[in-house]
A protein has these predicted regions:
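Soluble catalytic domains of membrane acyltransferases
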Residues: 69-191
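Short, Lys/Arg-enriched N-terminal segments with co-localized hydrophobic residues
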Residues: 1-6
């Protein structure tokens, strides 16, 4: 028992130092990822298609996977994303959800309109084919629904967070069921 307590005390005393060391290692990796990999990704997004392949989509997936790696995160995927016009549904705990989803499959996510004006993040959201929604505006919602249906019919994936906001992960919030109408109208699968 004393040995276990001593190990526990040593581990907890070493934890702040380990955290500092992890951060010291990750900061240069993050800087490299933002200063080198991001411009390469943006260039590939601008090129978009090479030989019929969507290199922009591949670049976004590559960049998202790299960012997760820099932060020491791993995604455990169960199953395979359906190809083509599929509506992907996920809980929304924070910004990392977007990166995790894009690391697995390219999709245009529904985002609040304010994000469009954010420095760098807004541009990345546009490059990631986000569909912007002005919250509380019925006309904007109708436009978003029409855009989602059109993209799904055209064979492009769309991602939604039906709780329409972030949660702490302990409980589900109410779903905005109307968002699923786009998949029904487009006769698209939901995953």
């Amino acid at each position: 028992l004393r040995q276990v307590q001593a190990m526990s005390a040593t581990t907890s005393a070493a934890e702040p130092l380990l955290r500092v060391l992890r951060t010291a290692c990750r900061l240069p990796l993050l800087a490299w990822h933002l200063l080198v990999h991001l411009p390469v990704t943006l260039l590939l997004i601008a090129i978009d298609t090479v030989g019929g392949k969507r290199v922009g989509h591949l670049a976004i997936r590559w960049w998202a996977r790299g960012l997760l790696w820099v932060f020491g995160m791993r995604v455990r995927r169960i199953g395979t994303p359906l190809p083509g016009g599929t509506m992907f549904v996920a809980n929304h705990l924070g910004w990392i959800d977007i990166v995790a989803l894009h690391s697995q499959h390219m999709m245009g996510l529904i985002a609040k309109a304010e994000i469009r004006g954010w420095p760098l993040i807004g541009w990345l959201a546009k490059a990631g084919e986000s569909i912007f929604l002005q919250r509380g505006n019925a006309h904007s919602l109708a436009d978003v629904m029409a855009e989602m249906s059109q993209r799904l019919r055209a064979g492009h994936a769309v991602g939604v967070f039906p709780e329409a906001g972030t949660r702490d992960g302990r409980e589900l919030g109410p779903f905005h069921a109307r968002i699923f109408t786009a998949a029904v109208e487009a006769d698209a699968p939901v995953q």
